Regions:
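Residues at the C-termini of beta-strands that transition into short coil/loop
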Residues: 13, 28, 64-67
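Short coil-to-beta-strand transition motifs
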Residues: 16-20
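Short conserved beta-strand and strand-loop elements enriched in small hydrophobics
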Residues: 6-15
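Residue patterns forming the tRNA-binding/recognition surfaces of aminoacyl-tRNA synthetases
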Residues: 6, 33-238
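Short beta-strand-centered aromatic/proline hotspots
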Residues: 21-27
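Conserved, ordered domain cores of eukaryotic regulatory proteins
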Residues: 1-2
Length: 239
């Protein structure tokens, strides 16, 4: 892939005349022995892609809302693409607020459930001849072609209760910069003030604290049970 680094490729969805170009970059994250060795990056909706996007300073465009529906806000797709192209060409400066306000979901996909949108993308890519096709035989023995789909294991989070696929997304949260407060904990073990038993646990301890991530301290879950309380127009409480 070396000759392709620094070039651009087209995202094959949406009206042909408005399709967006994205850069082809290199990173140590992809496994060259897994699949093609090349991956797409969706920084706003994948933990690993987020880190890759940060390292390469790639804008992270959110495509879904909190209900798993493709976004419907923002300008028409052609206008958002023009703005994204200007950002790519370094014609305009950008920050997180600008990127968060932009909706790069093609107009025909807006408002669709995420799974509906996926099926529509596959159908349209296949119809346009952009999918890899393989020979297939139907139940009656007739030979045809179909889009090639590889079955590969991936790490996919599901909700414990809903059993529904969890989609990572960018939200505003409060974090503690833990890298600034771990030094005393590291020094306490290094100088012998704290002894880890068995001693082999020290390696795990050092690896954890030396690679610690910021700690998210804000929550969207309920703390405890909700108590049903009502107030009438006179201020009386009913529980």
């Amino acid at each position: 892939y070396k000759p392709l680094i620094g070039k651009f490729c087209e995202i094959p969805v949406g009206p042909k005349q408005y399709r967006r170009l994205i850069p082809i970059i290199t990173d140590e994250y992809p496994d060259p022995n897994f699949g093609s060795g090349a991956v797409k990056i969706t920084g706003a909706h994948d933990f690993n892609d987020y880190q890759v996007a940060k390292r390469s300073n790639i804008p992270m465009y959110s495509l879904m809302d909190k209900k798993g529906v493709m976004r419907v806000d923002g300008l028409p797709y052609k206008d958002e693409v023009a703005k994204a192209q200007a950002i790519l060409n370094e014609e305009i400066n950008w920050d997180e607020d600008l990127i968060a306000s932009m909706n790069l979901v093609p107009d025909e996909y807006r408002g669709l459930d995420r799974f509906e949108a996926r099926k529509k993308v596959v159908t349209e890519i296949t119809a346009e001849g952009l999918a890899v096709m393989v020979d297939a035989t139907d139940n009656e023995g007739n030979l045809s072609t179909k889009a090639f789909v590889e079955s590969k294991p991936i790490m996919q989070p599901f909700g414990d209760r809903s059993k529904v696929v969890i989609e990572p997304m960018l939200t505003d949260q409060w974090f503690v910069e833990t890298s600034k407060i771990v030094k005393p904990a590291l020094d306490a073990v290094k100088n012998g003030e704290i002894k880890i038993i068995p001693e082999s646990g020290e390696k795990t301890y050092y690896h954890w604290l030396n690679n610690i991530e910021p700690w998210c301290i804000s929550r969207q879950l309920w703390w405890g049970h909700q108590v049903p309380v009502w107030f009438d127009k006179d201020g009386n409480q009913y529980c």
